[in-house]
Amino acid sequence: DTAEITTENGQPVCVASLNRSFGHPAYTGRLRVIRAGDSLYLVNILPVEEYLKGVVPSEMPASYASEALKSQTVCARSYAFTAIQNPKYSFADLNDSTACQVYMNQNTDPRTDNAVESTAGEVLSFHQQIASAKYFSSSCGSLSSDDDVWTYPDTGQGDSYMTARLETEPPTLCALSSEAAFVDFILHPEADTYLEASDPWFRWQVTLSMTTIRSNISELFARRMAADPKRFTLLSSDG
């Protein structure tokens, strides 16, 4: 069962039952309510360029420099189009959380609106295809190769343009395959060379019991093996 909500004059529709960081969000376009079993899903139907006006200020502070906002916009637009080409959901192209891109967690802003409008239609591409522009809010200073995180079911490989490297200026290749190199990288980073060194999540600590660590690793390995068994080699009890 579905129902659609629109306004006669095209004004945004405020959803008072939702709370975001700035209050109750108001959505442009059409709102579709879908009932599936005991759940209700609220789907916002609107053009990509209007969608981006709700994404960019939610993913990057509107106070950032205009060129940074434009870069974020191009990444967000590229991500959105690749998601539309490869939908995860039966009733929508994306969701509004960090599982895709955060949408309408911050109100729209003239500065981010301008970034969207001034880059209209611009995307990242690789070999004439729109690139899947995955991005993040914080890291330890190192990027991973796409093969290490995401792979395509038909090839078992990721996107070749996403390669492992350190987030330095200029970028440098990763050399963290040995235990000693990784420990040194974590404990003694050259803070002035990493772009995110001032971020509070650049380095952090947590204490876990060995039981919890074993349980977490076993669960994660089991899930990854089920999803992509070809990437694992099992060691038998006899070596």
Where are these regions (language model features)?
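Conserved, single-site charged/polar hotspot
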Residues: 1-239
